[in-house]
Amino acid sequence: MKKRFGILLMAAMLAVSAVFASGCESKPKEKIKIAALKGPTGMGLVKLMEDNSDLYEITLYDSPDQIVSKIVTGEIDGAAVPSNLAPILYTKTQKKIKLTNVTTTGVLYIVENGDTVKSIADLKGKTIYASGKGGTPEFALNYILKQNGLTPDVDVKIEWKADHATVSAAVASGEAQIGLLPEPFVTTTKAKVATLSVPIDMTQEWSKASGGSSELIMGAFVMTTNIIDTRKADVDAFLEKYKASVDYVNKNPKDAAALIAKHGILPSAAVAEAAIPRSNIVFTSAQDAKKSLEGFFTVLKDSDPASIGGTMPDENFYYTGK
C-alpha cells in the first residue's frame, strides 16, 4: 500500500512539475524597448516596426534630450541617436552601452533660394541660416568651411536658429537666402519654394575636406550592455531585422513612405518618398564603420572635446557580435 502511495505521489509531483515547466516555457519574453527619433534616424526602422510589434516596443521622440535619461537609467534597451551622442552616452553610463551600427551618413545640405552658390567658395561673404549649434551640424559646417579656407563668422556669417523648422520657414519666406538643412526639411522647403536649389551636399564636401580619411556620419544605434549580456541572441536577431528593414526602405521607397507616414516618423508619405533618396539611410555594423567613426570622432574632438564626451571612446565601445 505504501509503495503504491509513493508511486502515486511521485506521479502527482511529476505532473505538477510538468505544468510549471510548461508555464515557464510558454511565458513570452519581455519586449526589447527601443527609442528612435522622428526623421531619417527613425526611418530605417519602419519595416521592423510594422512587422515585429510583438517583439519590440519602439517609441518615437522629437529630441535626443528625451532619450538620454532613458538610456542612462536603463529604462530602454537601445536607441537610434545622433552619432556624436553615442560616445557621450558611453561616458555618461560608465561604458554600459555599445555602438552596434551606423544608421545614417550625411543628411545635411546647403540650400539656396536662388542660384548664386555653386561651391563652398561661393559662400564667402554670405549669411547661412542654420540649426544645431553645439551639435554635429555646427561642427560639420565649421570643419568644411575651415578646410576650404573660410573662417566661420568672419568670411561666412552664420545665423543660428532654434530648430530646422525655423530655418526652413526663413528660407521659404525669403528672410534667408541660404540655409543649412537636413532631410526631410530640404524636401518640405523645396515644396514651398519653386526656385530652391540644393547646390551643396555636405556629405560629399566632408569627404573632400578630410581627404577621404573619414565620413560624415549623422546617426548611430546603441544598445545597453545589460541587454547584450543577458539576451545576446535576441539582440543579434534584432540587428538582422534592422538591416533587412533598412534594405526594404531603400529598395521600396513608395511602400516604405506609406509606412513612415503611418507610424508618424514623418508627416506625409509624399514627403517621405521624396526624402528617402537623400536621407542616406544605412545599416553599417560597428566593425565595418569603426575606421570611419574614429576619423569622424577625431574631427569632432579636435573642434570641441565636449562634442563627444571629452575623450575618444575605447575599443569596448564598438559591438563586435562576440
Each predicted region: which residue ranges?
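Secondary-structure end/capping motifs
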Residues: I228-S303
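Short, low-complexity disordered leader/linker segments with a strong preference
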Residues: M1-K31
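Pocket-lining segment of extracytoplasmic ligand-binding domains
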Residues: N84-L85, A165-L259
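Solvent-exposed, polar/charged alpha-helical surfaces in well-ordered, non-transmembrane soluble domains
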Residues: M43-E50, D65, S69, T73, ...
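Short, surface-exposed acidic
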Residues: P152-V156, G264-A275, S307-D314
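Conserved C-terminal helix/tail region of periplasmic/extracytoplasmic solute-binding proteins
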Residues: E294-K322
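Short, glycine-/small- and polar/acidic-enriched structural segments
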Residues: K27-D153, I158-W160, Q177, E183, ...
